[in-house]
Amino acid sequence: MPEVERKSKITASRKLMLKSLMLAKAKECWEQEHEEREAEKVRYLSERIPTLQTRGLSLSALQDLCRELHAKVEVVDEERYDIEAKCLHNTREIKDLKLKVLDLRGKFKRPPLRRVRVSADAMLRALLGSKHKVSMDLRANLKSVKKEDTEKERPVEVGDWRKNVEAMSGMEGRKKMFDAAKSPTSQ
């Protein structure tokens, strides 16, 4: 059954109008939020920083006021430094935790693995631990074959190699090779 393209229920002009209305509303909200932040900033500064009355103060009173203000500035500067250090520490910790989460999820790129030849004994040691002394001799189960018997069964033909080359050349030689390959399997 061929799939029928679904027509949008909203026309393109209507979509565009809705999009522009949404952007206008978002802009209004952003401007309002910005104004609220500025008002909050002014209110906070007016609470924390009292207006200075420097008129009518003597030189010694002005110097005392300056020393007092410098001390307050130093305290605020130390607090700012401490907050920056805490923020930096928290940022590093967040970064480390994000890496741990990625490791746990398995979302990191795995390096290409190389094949490593491991003997059966080494594999068992790795699986069971170093406490267990397990020896797995796989060759013990194999049937032993004596080399001398196999060599005696086949008689070694020693002949002139030139005659063999001449005999095997041409179509007759190929036929002999074909027949020779056929004969051992039929026995």
Swiss-Prot record:
SUPFAM superfamilies: Troponin coil-coiled subunits. Residues 97-118 are annotated as: Involved in binding TNC and actin. InterPro entries: Troponin, Troponin_I, Troponin_sf. GO terms for biological process: transition between fast and slow fiber; ventricular cardiac muscle tissue morphogenesis. Transmembrane segments: none annotated. GO terms for molecular function: actin binding. The modification N-acetylproline is found at P2. The modification Phosphoserine is found at S58. Coiled coil: none annotated. It comes from the Eukaryota. Keywords: Acetylation, Actin-binding, Muscle protein, Phosphoprotein. Residues 2-48 are annotated as: Involved in binding TNC. GO terms for cellular component: troponin complex. PANTHER family: TROPONIN I, TROPONIN I, SLOW SKELETAL MUSCLE. Troponin I is the inhibitory subunit of troponin, the thin filament regulatory complex which confers calcium-sensitivity to striated muscle actomyosin ATPase activity. Belongs to the troponin I family. Binds to actin and tropomyosin. This is Troponin I, slow skeletal muscle. The gene is Tnni1.
